[in-house]
Amino acid sequence: PSMFYEKVLHKKPLKISNKPSVLKHSMSLFVIYFSTKKIYDHIQHHTIIFNKRHKELLKDIFDKKVMIDDPSLYLHRPMATDGKGQQFESDSFYVLAPVPNNSSNINWNDYGDKFKNIVFDILEDYALPGLKKSLVDSFYITPNYFEDELNTYAGSGFGIQPIFRQSAYFRYSNKAPEFNNLYFVGASTHPGAGVPGVISTAKATEKLILKDYGIS
């Protein structure tokens, strides 16, 4: 809803608490998809590499919104469960790093390649030895992708933050109060984020539409 109000409607929501610039939006993500000619059998389906200064890192991402050079990482290796890549003697992954959203004004066009190398260095040191020599192909997406292609506000990865004053009733309503025929679903909409929350928003919005249009 934040992006829709700002970019499509070009107006502010009636509820001042739902003004996009007032709301706290979630972090964004830097995601690298890559394949290797080496099979890393010791890596499970899900791996998390925590930064040693975890609390300070969160402050840099959420509060200071500054560029980081020591991210925590989530590594996803589907081959650990699927196994089909082994017949081709290759492996595939994606790795994501939480980063500030685009309200930080970080120029990802300039910094993207450097940050990719930082991530690969961490992976090589802590999880995937010999990674750089084993790389077959890779590409990455930045907060710009979330903002420009997925139309998320400031490139946020998960909508508005699920803090108390932005939870449940305080999130965007399922029906826009300014219009009789505008409805919302999604992570930033009541009742909340996450897959169960998003499904719940769809069910709640469906009930509103059926009621408004007299459909039983």
Regions found by a protein language model. Name each.
Residues 1-86:
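Mid-domain catalytic core of redox enzymes
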Residues 2-6, 35, 87-122:
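Conserved FAD/dinucleotide-binding core of flavoprotein oxidoreductases
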Residues 83-90, 173-178:
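Short glycine/proline-enriched loop/turn "hinge" motifs that connect secondary-structure elements
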Residues 187-209:
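A conserved FAD-binding loop/helix module that cradles the flavin
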Residues 34, 95, 123, 182, ...:
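Hydrophobic, well-ordered secondary-structure elements that form the walls
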Residues 74, 129-191:
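A glycine-rich dinucleotide-binding beta-alpha-beta segment and adjacent secondary-structure elements
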Residues 211-216:
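Active-site-proximal substrate-binding core of FAD-dependent oxidoreductases
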Residues 39, 66-68, 108-148:
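Flavin-binding catalytic cores
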